[in-house]
């Protein structure tokens, strides 16, 4: 199939994953074939062929889907796409088309008769007198799901082992969330469950060729920040170095997914997740296979695209989807004017955090090769080194911090964000760059409640004034790696105090936090604040271990205990 230029410098390709591709000056043929080694078997089913991709709700019953979402039948656009059709979706849609014009037709009654509702994850039936650490230990069982078989027509994807969901509206496993959740599981001694989650992600790679955003059909067209190598590293800390070789095949497939399309991309062009800069350097961006509204946010996306007059709607949809893949949905980082979602251009941005994670993946692949010093180990290490050089050349702001790069306008962002600490977390920063980044962060992003996501207020949830548990951990861990103990402690203790304060008032942990003194949970975004909450639980346990005395023994303020009926 010939390449189709979707927009300036953006090449769409249907090519297979790279097998002999020039990446950062090295040929992939030097190490992909030699490194396809026999590894220890996974404790997961052997997958002989890719699983058929199930239709998404907007594909399975398009007219009914649009009627429900555009009619705002439910407050949350994700609610309906998680419903279980009780019979063949094609028949349901046909019945809708035959009946919807009839006098007295009731759309809500039609949906109720043909679908089973998926309730949110309930976490509020725990004793009210528990201390924070005990509360988290009691939360884990409430967040565990086991779905090795799902009913026909469900948007949920089956997984062979139990897994932990975030909580609230998030009834499925999420890729990057899970690393921070797994940190907490290991800290809680639940290493078997942590291993099972890692095996689930290996299964998804083997089954679909990548780890999707989450285990839903409507998430299959994209991934999320690539933390699989960090998960392998975490489990190796539990089981030993053999873990690296066990997951080598899946690490290679993960890398191939993110580098797919690099075979033919020319300087100044992009293909899928890959961008080749004018000097030949190859870095990565976020991207999505589809360029339609997200089913789980259909009305939000169509309204955003309708505000854009100078770009095709398909471009806007892909940028919205790519923003969802980034995990930062949404933020001023992706906005051309820094304020309005209608100016989103995620696919034009080379993010510092994504490329730091891929550096770690390359380093992990080098380590995972069977013999130290083998050709594949040297070649993956060389790729990591060349990515580091490209990051230093293009993503380092001389004002003293790492930033994102716009490959279309060839400009480096002047915005400082929490993502600037990812190079420290990945261990790629020089001592000088780490010191200067820490100094800039100390001046610009430290708040009474921890590390700010950005210094810009837009109303988007990944901007000021919100703080997010995963970014606190990336900061604390990265700063500690480079000897910035005082700043790490300041961020960690302040965020932990914020978590403890809200827990004392409301007896819950939430998805995001406001960072001002005595602030409530964070705001903004496309949905209400969620509690549970997987990654907050994991990071909180890590911080309690690092900085004991900051809420480790404190119990919440006394409250009137809800009855079980009220909790339900």
Curated annotation (Swiss-Prot):
Record key words, sorted: Glycosidase, Hydrolase, Periplasm, Signal
Binding locations of substrate: 169, 176-177, 213, 222-224, 294-296, 327, 526
Compartments (UniProt record): Periplasm
Secretion signal span: 1-39
Keyword Signal: yes
Gene3D superfamilies: 1.50.10.10
GO cellular component, one term: periplasmic space
Biological process, per Gene Ontology: cellular hyperosmotic response; trehalose catabolic process
Catalysed reactions listed for this entry: alpha,alpha-trehalose + H2O = alpha-D-glucose + beta-D-glucose
Classification via InterPro entries: 6-hairpin_glycosidase_sf, 6hp_glycosidase-like_sf, Glyco_hydro_37, Glyco_hydro_37_CS, Trehalase_periplasmic
Catalytic residues of the enzyme: 329, 511
Record GO terms (molecular function): alpha,alpha-trehalase activity
EC number: 3.2.1.28
Top-level EC class as recorded in UniProt: hydrolase
Described function: Provides the cells with the ability to utilize trehalose at high osmolarity by splitting it into glucose molecules that can subsequently be taken up by the phosphotransferase-mediated uptake system.
PANTHER family, per the entry: TREHALASE (PTHR23403:SF1)
UniProt similarity note: Belongs to the glycosyl hydrolase 37 family.
Name of the protein in its database record: Periplasmic trehalase
The organism's taxonomic lineage, starting at the top: Bacteria, Pseudomonadati, Pseudomonadota, Gammaproteobacteria, Lysobacterales
């Amino acid at each position: 199939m010939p390449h189709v230029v979707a927009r300036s410098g953006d090449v769409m390709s249907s090519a297979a994953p790279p097998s002999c591709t020039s990446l950062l000056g090295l040929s992939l043929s030097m190490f992909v074939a030699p490194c396809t080694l026999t590894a220890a078997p996974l404790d997961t089913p052997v997958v002989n062929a890719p699983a058929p991709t199930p239709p998404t709700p907007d594909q399975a019953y398009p007219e009914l889907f649009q009627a429900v979402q555009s009619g705002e039948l439910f407050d949350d656009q994700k609610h309906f796409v998680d419903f279980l059709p009780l019979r063949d979706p094609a028949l349901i849609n046909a019945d809708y088309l035959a009946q919807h014009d009839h006098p007295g037709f009731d759309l809500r009654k039609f949906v109720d008769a043909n679908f089973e509702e998926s309730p949110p994850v309930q976490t509020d039936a725990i004793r009210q007198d528990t201390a924070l650490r005990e509360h988290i230990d009691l939360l884990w069982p409430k967040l565990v799901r086991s779905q090795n078989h799902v009913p026909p027509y469900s948007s949920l994807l089956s997984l062979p082992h139990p897994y932990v969901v975030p909580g609230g509206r998030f009834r499925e496993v999420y890729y990057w969330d899970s690393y921070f959740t797994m940190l907490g599981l290991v800290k809680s001694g639940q290493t078997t469950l942590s291993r099972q989650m890692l095996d689930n992600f290996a299964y998804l790679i083997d089954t679909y060729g990548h780890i999707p955003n989450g285990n839903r059909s409507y998430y299959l067209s994209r991934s999320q920040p690539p933390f699989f190598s960090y998960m392998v590293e975490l489990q190796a800390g539990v089981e030993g170095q053999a873990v690296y070789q066990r997951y080598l095949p899946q690490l290679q497939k993960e890398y191939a997914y993110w580098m797919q399309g690099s075979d033919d991309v020319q300087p100044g062009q992009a293909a899928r997740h890959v961008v080749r800069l004018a000097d030949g350097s190859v870095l990565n961006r976020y991207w999505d296979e589809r360029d339609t509204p997200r089913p789980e946010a259909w009305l939000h996306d169509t309204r955003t695209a309708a505000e854009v007059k100078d770009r095709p709607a398909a471009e806007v949809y892909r940028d919205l989807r790519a923003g969802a893949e980034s995990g930062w949905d949404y933020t001023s980082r992706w906005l051309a004017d820094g304020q309005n979602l209608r100016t989103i251009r995620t696919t034009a941005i080379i993010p510092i955090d994504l490329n730091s994670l891929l550096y770690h993946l390359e380093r992990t692949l080098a380590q995972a090769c069977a013999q130290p010093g083998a050709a594949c180990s040297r070649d993956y290490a060389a790729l990591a080194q060349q990515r580091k050089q490209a990051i230093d050349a293009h993503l380092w702001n001389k004002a003293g911090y790492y930033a994102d790069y716009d490959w279309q306008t060839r400009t480096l962002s002047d915005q400082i964000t929490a993502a600037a600490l990812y190079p420290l977390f990945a261990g790629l920063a020089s001592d000088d760059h780490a010191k200067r980044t820490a100094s800039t962060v100390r001046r610009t992003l430290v708040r009474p409640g921890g590390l700010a996501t950005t210094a810009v207020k837009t109303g988007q949830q990944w901007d000021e004034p919100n703080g997010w548990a995963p970014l606190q951990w990336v900061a604390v861990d990265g700063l500690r790696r480079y000897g910035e103990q005082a700043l790490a402690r300041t961020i960690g203790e302040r965020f932990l105090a914020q978590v403890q304060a809200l827990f004392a008032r409301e007896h819950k942990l939430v998805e995001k936090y406001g960072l001002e003194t005595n602030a409530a949970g964070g705001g903004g975004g496309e949905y209400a604040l969620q509690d549970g909450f997987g990654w907050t639980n994991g990071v909180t346990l890590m911080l309690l271990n690092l900085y004991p005395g900051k809420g480790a023994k404190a119990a919440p303020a006394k409250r009137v205990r809800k009855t079980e009926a009220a909790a339900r």
